Amino acid sequence: MRQVTIPLIQSKSMFCVIYRSSKRDQTYLYVEKKDDFSRVPEALMKGFGQPQLAMILPLDGRKKLVNAELEKVKQALREQGYYLQLPPPPEDLLKQHLSTVGQNTSHADR
Protein backbone atom coordinates (compact mmCIF):
# COMPACT_ATOMS: atom_id res chain seq x y z
CA MET A 1 0.00 0.00 0.00
CA ARG A 2 1.38 3.36 -1.00
CA GLN A 3 1.28 6.23 1.49
CA VAL A 4 0.28 9.62 0.25
CA THR A 5 1.57 12.64 2.09
CA ILE A 6 -0.78 15.56 2.11
CA PRO A 7 0.97 18.85 2.76
CA LEU A 8 -0.50 20.82 5.61
CA ILE A 9 -1.39 24.38 4.93
CA GLN A 10 -0.26 26.31 7.93
CA SER A 11 -1.97 29.57 8.53
CA LYS A 12 0.06 32.04 10.48
CA SER A 13 -2.05 33.02 13.45
CA MET A 14 -1.66 36.58 14.62
CA PHE A 15 -0.79 37.02 18.27
CA CYS A 16 0.33 40.03 20.20
CA VAL A 17 2.15 40.36 23.46
CA ILE A 18 0.98 43.21 25.66
CA TYR A 19 3.26 44.98 28.13
CA ARG A 20 2.31 47.50 30.83
CA SER A 21 4.47 50.60 31.26
CA SER A 22 6.41 50.92 34.49
CA LYS A 23 6.49 54.73 34.08
CA ARG A 24 3.06 55.67 32.76
CA ASP A 25 -0.25 54.55 34.22
CA GLN A 26 -2.69 52.86 31.81
CA THR A 27 -0.12 52.81 28.99
CA TYR A 28 0.44 49.55 27.11
CA LEU A 29 2.79 48.42 24.36
CA TYR A 30 1.70 45.67 21.95
CA VAL A 31 4.43 43.74 20.08
CA GLU A 32 4.41 40.64 17.87
CA LYS A 33 6.85 38.47 19.84
CA LYS A 34 7.58 38.11 23.53
CA ASP A 35 10.49 40.29 24.67
CA ASP A 36 11.19 41.48 21.09
CA PHE A 37 11.34 45.27 21.14
CA SER A 38 13.69 45.51 18.15
CA ARG A 39 11.18 47.49 16.04
CA VAL A 40 10.17 49.86 18.86
CA PRO A 41 11.96 53.24 18.72
CA GLU A 42 14.55 53.72 21.45
CA ALA A 43 13.01 57.02 22.59
CA LEU A 44 9.63 55.33 23.06
CA MET A 45 11.20 52.52 25.10
CA LYS A 46 13.01 55.06 27.27
CA GLY A 47 9.77 56.90 28.05
CA PHE A 48 7.85 53.64 28.48
CA GLY A 49 10.21 52.29 31.12
CA GLN A 50 10.75 48.62 31.97
CA PRO A 51 8.01 46.67 30.15
CA GLN A 52 5.93 44.47 32.45
CA LEU A 53 4.25 41.50 30.74
CA ALA A 54 0.47 41.88 30.98
CA MET A 55 -0.81 39.17 28.60
CA ILE A 56 -0.41 37.26 25.35
CA LEU A 57 -3.46 37.65 23.16
CA PRO A 58 -4.53 35.89 19.94
CA LEU A 59 -5.93 38.44 17.48
CA ASP A 60 -7.36 36.01 14.92
CA GLY A 61 -11.07 35.37 15.33
CA ARG A 62 -11.37 38.27 17.77
CA LYS A 63 -13.99 40.89 16.96
CA LYS A 64 -12.81 43.67 19.28
CA LEU A 65 -10.43 44.71 22.01
CA VAL A 66 -11.35 46.49 25.23
CA ASN A 67 -9.46 49.78 24.88
CA ALA A 68 -8.07 49.70 21.35
CA GLU A 69 -9.42 49.32 17.83
CA LEU A 70 -8.58 45.80 16.62
CA GLU A 71 -7.84 46.77 13.00
CA LYS A 72 -5.58 49.65 14.06
CA VAL A 73 -3.64 47.27 16.33
CA LYS A 74 -3.24 44.67 13.56
CA GLN A 75 -2.18 47.29 11.02
CA ALA A 76 0.35 48.87 13.39
CA LEU A 77 1.83 45.46 14.25
CA ARG A 78 2.21 44.60 10.55
CA GLU A 79 3.58 47.97 9.44
CA GLN A 80 5.70 49.17 12.34
CA GLY A 81 6.01 46.15 14.63
CA TYR A 82 4.32 47.69 17.66
CA TYR A 83 1.20 49.50 18.84
CA LEU A 84 1.16 51.97 21.72
CA GLN A 85 -2.06 52.23 23.73
CA LEU A 86 -2.30 55.48 25.65
CA PRO A 87 -4.71 56.11 28.53
CA PRO A 88 -8.07 57.65 27.71
CA PRO A 89 -8.23 61.42 28.23
CA PRO A 90 -9.28 62.38 31.75
CA GLU A 91 -12.94 63.18 32.17
CA ASP A 92 -13.67 66.79 32.95
CA LEU A 93 -16.43 66.17 35.48
CA LEU A 94 -16.78 69.86 36.38
CA LYS A 95 -17.31 70.79 32.72
CA GLN A 96 -19.89 67.99 32.35
CA HIS A 97 -21.69 69.13 35.50
CA LEU A 98 -21.74 72.80 34.46
CA SER A 99 -23.01 71.81 31.01
CA THR A 100 -25.82 69.77 32.57
CA VAL A 101 -26.69 72.53 35.05
CA GLY A 102 -26.70 75.08 32.22
CA GLN A 103 -29.09 72.94 30.18
CA ASN A 104 -31.40 72.43 33.16
CA THR A 105 -31.38 76.16 33.96
CA SER A 106 -32.28 77.13 30.39
CA HIS A 107 -35.22 74.68 30.44
CA ALA A 108 -36.43 76.11 33.77
CA ASP A 109 -36.41 79.67 32.41
CA ARG A 110 -38.97 78.88 29.72
Swiss-Prot record:
Source taxon at top rank: Bacteria
Chain coiled-coil ranges: none
All residue ranges annotated as the YcgL domain in the record: 14-98
Stored InterPro entries: YcgL-like_sf, YcgL_dom
Transmembrane segments: none
HAMAP family xref list: UPF0745
Protein name: Protein YcgL
